[in-house]
């Protein structure tokens, strides 16, 4: 004999439809999802709280909207380095690396930055700049603050160009030690600055393999707040760490 299981006068099938409708996700438009009609003939909708929660989740991961104007850089240690990435006028990222941190927290005797990493950053910046129409090279974004740099490599040398605003030739020291190129500058405090303001300081160590460069032939020139450094390369026949292998 056929029988119907009911709870408080309502068929079990109706209760199951209501439970399934309550667990159903909202549609992409944010409107509730209608389920099969209940016994009353009215559609069953998801609870308002569940709909609001799902909508908030979609907003959390939705990055469309007003473009960001500043990008903080987190270094390899996981801390904010103080460096910035500027955005183009239409909000697209323009990756212009900065040679020095804004607060000069770099330890002159700490771990040096490898030359390969600097050149890789420069290549990435050049690609990003070329892909962003309406910009005038690296100078467009970099001119907004000091500490920008340009690095390039040719067959004869590696060339660095570093912005050190407020400093003159007498404020800058460049030397090579223990396979590293050290660039250090410290300017004079501006009398118009606040009492707590520190004078401009710049420090950077770049790792250079001494067996690939002429460390005693490095040249540096400071002019109009821009330091230019040329590190000549050793020719392959001059390198003592390169040994040709005869192929038989």
From Swiss-Prot:
Keywords for this protein: Mitochondrion, Stress response, Transit peptide
Domain sHSP: 139-248
Region called Disordered, residue ranges: 26-48
Compartment annotation: Mitochondrion
Gene Ontology biological process terms, A to Z: response to heat
InterPro entries in UniProt: A-crystallin/Hsp20_dom (IPR002068), HSP14.7/HSP23.5/HSP23.6-like (IPR044656), HSP20-like_chaperone (IPR008978)
Subunit structure: May form oligomeric structures.
Family statement: Belongs to the small heat shock protein (HSP20) family.
Protein name (Swiss-Prot/TrEMBL): 26.2 kDa heat shock protein, mitochondrial
